[in-house]
Amino acid sequence: MSENFRSKAITQGVQRSPNRAMLRAVGFQDADFTKAIVGVANGYSTITPCNMGINQLAQRAEAGINTAGAKPQIFGTITISDGISMGTEGMKYSLVSREVIADSIETVCNGQSLDGVIAIGGCDKNMPGAMIAIARINIPAIFVYGGTIKPGHYNGKDLTVVSSFEAVGEYSAGKIDENELLAVERNACPGAGSCGGMYTANTMSSAFEALGMSLPYSSTMAAEDDEKADSTEESAKVLVEAIRHQLLPRQIITRKSIENAISVIMAVGGSTNAVLHFLAIARAAGVELNLDDFETIRGRVPVLCDLKPSGRYVATDLHKAGGIPQVMKMLLVHGLLHGDCMTITGKTIAEVLADIPEEPSPNQDVIRPWNNPMYAQGHLAILKGNLATEGAVAKITGVKNPVITGPAKVFESEEDCLDAILAGKIKAGDVIVIRYEGPKGGPGMREMLAPTSAIIGAGLGDSVGLITDGRFSGGTYGMVVGHVAPEAAVGGAIALVQEGDSITIDAHARSLQLNISDEELTRRRANWQPRPPRYTTGILAKYAKLVASSSVGAVTDLDLFNK
């Protein structure tokens, strides 16, 4: 039976002789023109350790597709290194790259009439970018994570890249000398793979496994281990079977499977960025999802894993302890997972997890027993109030002071804030406000890992609050609130805060409040004027024009023809 469900448009009939001529030049033989043509979206790049091992994985995917009787075609997609661009103008392009990746995969798959696609990515925006495209085009697809980095080691401690960011704050506070700073820098990132804690890349890969769009155990494998390459080849074979059975992404990415993914994000203590990305993925899949849904799930799912940034362990430790299947089985047994959701394997979640123990091994403490979780409820809270009428996102577990009321220290950019922290101008009890860093205002909604790490390094993590219309790295922890919406650039209340204003962040009440009267807020709003755009040409200008609020995922295709 012919398996070229879509590619027959470019391979069949007399009129397609020129098309076949070009395909012959890239290795097609007569027998290949009735096979499924499978794209391999290759995120290989030496820009970042996250992606530098992906080329070998793409080759294994190619081998798996050939073995399964289909025809592979490799194409490239881009990446930005969040870690390297952090704290610079370059970080404005990070969230933008999510859209570029999505658009590029959609463009190639539809432009070349591919029958399916295996997307291989590493750095943070590779995952949501690929899944947005997969949900849009709705052809058989599977996602392969490039793999996590192994921890670095120094002075008896495991290190991640966040250790280096925090060392900057420690050095500026006089807690370590330059030799110690350099030692951490030299040992933090020992090889290939994405940042090792439960930061954004590992959060999204774990969520995609829970979603059913990646193979079991694949999300926590180390990039440099043989099992990662073996899993990639197996993923390719599974995809070819999905093409034969026409198992489509929108049969897998449903409201219930997205709830499963969010539940796992809560259970592993994942990144705030997952909120933004799943809002966008849901939209691409035609699934209704809003911020309140995250809060509902947060209230019923415990944090089961002791993982960095706020915990002790990294993703490779989670893998040894049973990986995401162990976490999922615990949630399933306690009625917090939809077991009837389909996966890319052709089996349901319940079938995939059938042989997994109901409780984790007692010989490890990465995954806690159900009756002794890290926290009884999830950590990603949605805060609302007069400073964030559409909502804001915060990590609320593990903070020693769940309520902070203090004077506002207002900064118009991340750089100005970082300079003030390193100069010792921020004191215990202050509430830092970094604004005009939102999707439109940045533009690009930069991550604030540099200032938050500097706060931690300076010993102020438990006594200083930080709010922003920008984002936070998955490596961030402390009393920090991001994704404040509406953002400053569109006249949100964060634009109206004045130096010294009293602000309250209340994690218990999940509120974010500027402590001034409604009359004063109205007066300030009447006097507010929008700022001229920072960019008038190029991709940042286009992005600022098109991007929607963070409260709906900062997508760029919302109500396009009403703008």
Curated annotation (Swiss-Prot):
Residues where [2Fe-2S] cluster binds: C50, C123, C195
Gene3D superfamilies recorded: IlvD/EDD C-terminal domain-like (3.50.30.80)
Instruction: Cite a single Pfam family from the UniProt record.
Output: ILVD_EDD_N
**Entry keywords, A to Z:** 2Fe-2S, Amino-acid biosynthesis, Branched-chain amino acid biosynthesis, Iron, Iron-sulfur, Lyase, Magnesium, Metal-binding
Which cofactor(s) are needed, names only? [2Fe-2S] cluster; Mg(2+)
Concerning InterPro entries, the annotation shows: DHAD_IlvD/Edd, Dihydro-acid_dehy_C, DihydroxyA_deHydtase, DiOHA_6PGluconate_deHydtase_CS, ILV_EDD_C, ILV_EDD_N, IlvD/EDD_N
Q: Which GO terms describe its biological process?
A: isoleucine biosynthetic process; L-valine biosynthetic process
The residues responsible for catalysis, as annotated, are: S473
Reaction it catalyzes = (2R)-2,3-dihydroxy-3-methylbutanoate = 3-methyl-2-oxobutanoate + H2O; (2R,3R)-2,3-dihydroxy-3-methylpentanoate = (S)-3-methyl-2-oxopentanoate + H2O
Residues annotated as binding Mg(2+): D82, D124, K125, E447
In the record's cofactor note, how is the cofactor described as bound? Binds 1 [2Fe-2S] cluster per subunit. This cluster acts as a Lewis acid cofactor.
Pathway it works in: Amino-acid biosynthesis; L-isoleucine biosynthesis; L-isoleucine from 2-oxobutanoate: step 3/4; Amino-acid biosynthesis; L-valine biosynthesis; L-valine from pyruvate: step 3/4
Q: Which domain of life is it from?
A: Bacteria
Instruction: State the EC number(s).
Output: 4.2.1.9
Give the sites modified to N6-carboxylysine.
K125
Which GO molecular function entries does the Swiss-Prot or TrEMBL record give?
2 iron, 2 sulfur cluster binding; dihydroxy-acid dehydratase activity; magnesium ion binding
What does the record note on quaternary structure? Homodimer.
Protein family per UniProt? Belongs to the IlvD/Edd family.
Role played:
Functions in the biosynthesis of branched-chain amino acids. Catalyzes the dehydration of (2R,3R)-2,3-dihydroxy-3-methylpentanoate (2,3-dihydroxy-3-methylvalerate) into 2-oxo-3-methylpentanoate (2-oxo-3-methylvalerate) and of (2R)-2,3-dihydroxy-3-methylbutanoate (2,3-dihydroxyisovalerate) into 2-oxo-3-methylbutanoate (2-oxoisovalerate), the penultimate precursor to L-isoleucine and L-valine, respectively.
HAMAP family from the xrefs? IlvD (MF_00012)
Could you identify this protein by its name? Dihydroxy-acid dehydratase
